[in-house]
């Protein structure tokens, strides 16, 4: 009987996505994110999350590794990478880390019990790939395999990115998805009517995972996934650029984004903790963008900029 090794960490919610990516990059074959806020919170019309959702500070992330993996080495690597997150302004809190072995069938089923179809926006619902789901009138379904990597698409930064895409896409646009991760934003863009989507990620694992998730969804042949370092070397003009990544990285792509976004086009930036907000705003304004929408969920922020004169607004709570 094949066995797997389970590595569980408990971190502050704001470090959830970054910590999940670290576990994947250190060789995990899948992650489970156990966060009650994903399912207990009510989401308002414009993406605001009610206060009770943010009361639980810590989340538990479980990663699965092959029996042959050297968990002593992996544990040391994970600890080192988690410590580096503070350099990006992310507070991990008091990290707790445990390991155990489990049988193949337990690994295959354990993470599935955490996931169920989740309505994210007015039109978009994320559905685990193994679930039989009856689509409602007007509902657009994004199929994901959360066992692969990068969570389920229900993190506040992803939710706000999806709300923003729903806000700006009208059909026929070219979209660039920077740091695509699971590919969820690219799939959503296709479902919302974008003509062509170009998705980039520096991590080869993310490129593979994104393509696998894209292939789960019908009509996504208009999504092209390749490895890339932000927007460096890209010459494609886009109606919309979306980036859900760390704030320190976002500030490095604003000039290239302004070069690539068409007039009257949009730049959507998410993954911004409140203490880094001014830094991102300054970088985008310096590049020439005007703020159109500011969404807030707890300590997380998402910004929608336009390449034109605009009136700024704030959504959230």
Curated annotation (Swiss-Prot):
Highest taxon, organism lineage: Bacteria
Compartments where located: Cytoplasm
GO terms under biological process: methylation
Catalytic activity: L-lysyl-[protein] + 3 S-adenosyl-L-methionine = N(6),N(6),N(6)-trimethyl-L-lysyl-[protein] + 3 S-adenosyl-L-homocysteine + 3 H(+)
Documented EC number(s): 2.1.1.-
Family matches, as SUPFAM superfamilies: S-adenosyl-L-methionine-dependent methyltransferases
Molecular-function GO term, any one: protein-lysine N-methyltransferase activity
EC primary class: transferase
Pfam families: PrmA (PF06325)
Residues the record lists as binding S-adenosyl-L-methionine: 158, 179, 201, 244
Keywords noted in UniProt: Cytoplasm, Methyltransferase, S-adenosyl-L-methionine, Transferase
One cellular-component annotation, GO: cytoplasm
Family: Belongs to the methyltransferase superfamily. PrmA family.
Role, per record: Methylates ribosomal protein L11.
UniProt xrefs under PANTHER family: ELECTRON TRANSFER FLAVOPROTEIN BETA SUBUNIT LYSINE METHYLTRANSFERASE
Name of the featured protein: Ribosomal protein L11 methyltransferase
Gene designation per UniProt: prmA
